[in-house]
A protein has these predicted regions:
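N-terminal glutamine amidotransferase
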Residues: 1-80
Length: 80
């Protein structure tokens, strides 16, 4: 299972994607990621909870007014 959020706007949308992922995360979550676009794609993903994956440095790299975020919850198998 997973949770997905997508946004399109006129300004950088990282913070809104981040807040959305915080709202849909679950204690069983094992990974998350965000990709944004500003003419180039910018990606950050990792294992763990949303607040552990996205550091203040992530904000500087994930520029763009289009983006998708996801969280993953294992239903079978590992987090690989």
């Amino acid at each position: 299972m997973c949770g997905v959020i997508g946004l399109y706007g006129n300004t950088d949308i990282f913070r809104d994607l981040y807040q959305g992922l915080l709202a849909i995360q679950h204690r069983g979550q094992d990974s998350a990621g965000i990709i944004t676009y500003d003419g180039r794609f910018h990606t950050k993903k990792g294992n763990g909870l949303v607040q552990d994956i996205f550091t203040p440095e992530s904000v500087l790299r994930l520029k763009g007014s289009i983006g998708i975020g996801h969280t993953r919850y294992p239903t079978i198998g590992g987090g690989q």
